[in-house]
From Swiss-Prot:
Superkingdom per UniProt: Viruses
Similarity comment text for this entry: Belongs to the mulikevirus mom protein family.
Origin species: Escherichia phage D108
Main location: host cell
Protein name in UniProt: Methylcarbamoylase mom
Membrane-spanning residues: none
Keyword Nucleus on entry: no
Amino acid sequence: MPASIPRRNIVGKEKKSRILTKPCVIEYEGQIVGYGSKELRVETISCWLARTIIQTKHYSRRFVNNSYLHLGVFSGRDLVGVLQWGYALNPNSGRRVVLETDNRGYMELNRMWLHDDMPRNSESRAISYALKTIRLLYPSVEWVQSFADERCGRAGVVYQASNFDFIGSHESTFYELDGEWYHEITMNAIKRGGQRGMYLRANKERAVVHKFNQYRYIRFLNKRARKRLNTKLFRIQPYPKSSSD
C-alpha cells in the first residue's frame, strides 16, 4: 500500500469501467493486506470502520457479529465499499453444505456494500479481488458462500457475474416493525435475539409478516471441495432470474 495514502475518504466519485493497471498483491510493512490496482482494490480495514460503514450504508443497517475478515474497497484514494467475511449464522453449518468442512474451511460473505457511483462491474471485480486475498491470507478456506436476498428484487446477478454456482433457495420469514426489519431468527432465538428480539416478541401483533426467497450461491476454491458438495441436500442448478427480468 503506498505510503502516500495516509487517509481514506468514504466517498466514491471516480468511475473506472476498465482495468487500466494490472492488479497485483498489495503489501504494507511486509504483510499482505489485499489485492488489486490503483483503480480498484481491496485491503483489510478495521472491524469498527467496516461496521460503521455497513450500519450507515447497507440496506439492512446491521452488521454480522460472525465476520472476522473486513475488506475495504478502494478506488484511488477513496474508500468506496466494504465486504465482510466470516462464519455463517450457525458456524458449524458449513459441513452440512460441503462434507468434511470445519469452521476454518469456509467463509460466508456476510455483508457487501459498494458506492452507487461505481460502475456496474465493480462488484464482481471486488469479489474477485477479495477471493484472491482470502486465498493468500486464509489458505485453509476451500469454498465461500453468500445469499442473495429477494427483498432487493434481485436473484444474485452479482454472484452470477462472479462465476458462483447456484445451489438452491429457501423461503425466509421477515417481520417489519416500526421501520425496522427482523429475520425470523430474531423472533425465535431467545438467547441470540437480544433487546431487538425482546422488542419484536412484545410487539409481534403489530409486525407485518413478509416471506422472501433467499438464494444460496457457492464458489469453490479447489476441486476437492467441489467433489464433497452434499448432493443429498444441494445440487448445482441453472441460475434463477430476478423479478425485474
